Amino acid sequence: MGKQIRYYVHGHTGKGFIDLLPSNLEQINQIVLIENKNKKVVTALLETILTLLNEEDIEIIQSTLSKDLIDGIIIRNKSLAIIHESLYQANDNGKNIQRVTIPVDEDEDYFSLKDHQKIYDEAYNYFKKGLSIHDQLEKVYISKMDFNKANKVIEQLLQQLFKDVEKKKEKAILYERLFGTNTPDGIVNTVLNLIEPIEKKIFILGRAGTGKSYVMNQVLNKCIELGIDVELYRCSLDPNSIDMLIIRELNVCLHDNTAPHTIAVNDPSIQIIDMYKETVDQQVEKEYGERIKILQKKYKEQMQLGLKVLKSLNSN
C-alpha cells in the first residue's frame, strides 16, 4: 500500500479566501482537469482513482466545502495531478494540460462559489474582526516577552536540527499548504494524518504573540539556505503566520500545538518547546488578566459567528 497524505490548498481566513495550489503544482508536468460542476461527482471519480492507484504515494487535496469532499489528487513521483477544473487558474507554463468532461445532470444541484459569495464575504468579515482582536491579544503578551530568551531558544533549536547538515542543493522546493481551515463542517484539520509517519516531532506551545510562528520561520529560512525542501502549513486565521513545518528530508516536523489545532499524542519522544514559559514574564496574566479574558471572549465570539455563517451553506 502506498502512503496518503491529506491537506488543504484553499482556506477561509481572516484575510479572506486564499489559494495555495500553485506551489504544489510547480513541479508537476501533467495536469488533468475534471470538468463537472457537481463536487460529489468529482469526489466519486477521484475516490475511484485512489482505489485503483492504492500502491502509489498520493497527496489528497481536501475540499473546503465539506470534510467528505476532495478537490484533487497529486501523484508526485509520476509528476501527475488530477484536480477539479474550477480550482485551476490558467497558467500553463509549458505543462501538459488535459481536460476530462463529465456530463452534468441538469436535475442535480451543484455548489457554485459565485452563487454563495455573499455568504463567504459575511463570514470573512467576522474572521477579519477576529484576527484584529487576536492581534490586540498578541500585543499584550509581546509587551512582556524577553526577545533575548526567544533568540536563545531559536539558536538552540537551529543547532539541534541542522548541526552537521550540509547544503543539499541550490534551491529548496517550498510547498505552501494548510492542514485545516474554517468550513461549513466547522474547524477541520488533518494534522494527525500528516505527522504520523514523521520520526521527530516537535510541538511548540505558547500564547498569542509569543513567537511560535517566528520560531518556525527561522527554521524555514535555514532550510531554504541549505536547499532543503519544506512543507509549509500556514495559519488559517492569519495566513502570514506559520502553524506547522514538515521537513521530510530530516524526518522532522514542528507543530503549533495550541487551540484550535491541539492534538493529543501519547508519545514520550515528542519534544516540547513552550515559548510562553521560556520567554514571557509569567506575571503578564495576573497584570492583564481581565483584558486578556475580554479579548479572548470577543475573539471567540467573532470566530463562532463566522463559522455559523459558513455552516448555513449546508442548508443551501
Residue spans for each PLM region:
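N-terminal pre-Walker A segment at the start of P-loop NTPase domains
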Residues: 1-23, 121, 148-194
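Short, conserved, surface-exposed binding loops centered on an aromatic residue
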Residues: 194-195, 244
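Conserved nucleotide-sensing/catalytic segment adjacent to the nucleotide-binding pocket
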Residues: 1-16, 24, 30, 50-110, ...
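Residue-level marker of positions within ordered structural domains that often coincide
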Residues: 39, 87, 128, 259, ...
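Non-catalytic regulatory/linker segments of enzymes
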Residues: 18-21, 38-42, 75
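Glycine-rich phosphate-binding P-loop
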Residues: 30-51, 188, 199-223
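An accessory alpha-helical subdomain
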Residues: 111-166, 287, 291-316
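Short, flexible coil/linker segments at domain boundaries that flank nucleotide/cofactor-interacting
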Residues: 26-27, 197
